[in-house]
Regions:
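Mature extracytoplasmic or organellar-lumen-exposed domains after removal of signal/transit peptides
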Residues: 1-252
């Protein structure tokens, strides 16, 4: 949200005390900026004492967002796991499904998911908040900076990608089957390195991005993330005869 549109909408909502934002059915029709996890974080971590006030508008609004997010999470899980859900379409891709023409298209989509998620972590969650210099660093550009979860979010993202890459029958196993073990080993080593280095930081990312002494470590982390993304996109994908598809982070 480079232009702060979401925060302006939230400020207006607080000013107007819009009751339609406190009911799940009407909240679901509103702008994403008024009902996403960023909005919930703002409600909880900006003036948290207000949440304790009886009949607090902020509390009712936060509860409505939480309920809506729970409903959306349940829908997402069901869409993935039901008998004819997305997981089943992926597993049966070799026989052609509505989602995938064949197993190669399915595998290509998952390479793309790995690459695009790594790019989001590198560019949006770290590089952009850091700026080109310490003086240009912007803490407010960090994901969940109010709750100081920025580092933990990146760790969880990377652990998920690592598990996805190394799962039995996944990309790591496939690389070994085509005699490309060195690339599998290199990717696993980079995953381990970036996760370890993130977890080793003693200060929150909200402090580190503006800390001159931490700059070199953060830049090394960026380089390792870039190396991992490049390895998967330009080497591993070719090893497996795959071509990453459309990347939503590319803009146009």
């Amino acid at each position: 949200d480079k232009r702060g549109t979401g925060q302006r909408q939230l400020r207006q909502a607080f000013k107007d005390k819009d009751v339609t934002l406190t009911e799940g059915t009407t909240l679901a029709t509103k702008s994403v900026a008024l009902r996403d996890l960023q909005a919930l974080e703002t409600l909880i971590f900006v003036k948290p004492e207000v949440l304790l006030e009886p009949g607090s508008y902020r509390c009712a609004y936060a509860s409505a967002i939480a309920d809506l997010q729970r409903t959306q999470a349940a829908l997402l899980y069901d869409t993935w796991s039901r008998p004819n859900g997305f997981a089943a379409e992926l597993i049966n891709a070799a026989s052609s499904t509505p989602a995938f023409f064949d197993e190669r298209e399915a595998a290509g989509a998952y390479v793309n998911a790995l690459v695009s998620t790594l790019e989001v972590i590198r560019l949006q969650k770290l590089d952009r908040p850091m700026g080109l210099t310490v003086s240009e660093a912007r803490t407010s550009r960090l994901e969940n900076w109010r709750s100081k979860r920025s580092t933990q979010n990146m760790v969880l993202n990377l652990l998920t990608l690592q598990r996805f890459f190394a799962v039995e029958g996944g990309f790591s196993d496939l690389l070994r089957r085509v005699d490309k073990q060195e690339d599998a080993t290199a990717a696993e080593a980079l995953f381990n390195k970036v996760i370890y280095n993130l977890q080793a930081f003693e200060s929150p990312m909200e402090t580190l991005v503006a800390d001159t002494k931490a700059r070199s470590n953060l830049e090394s982390l960026l380089n390792d993330l870039r190396a991992l993304q490049t390895l998967i996109q330009e080497k591993i994908a070719i090893d497996l005869g795959l071509v990453p598809g459309f990347n939503a982070t590319d803009g146009d």
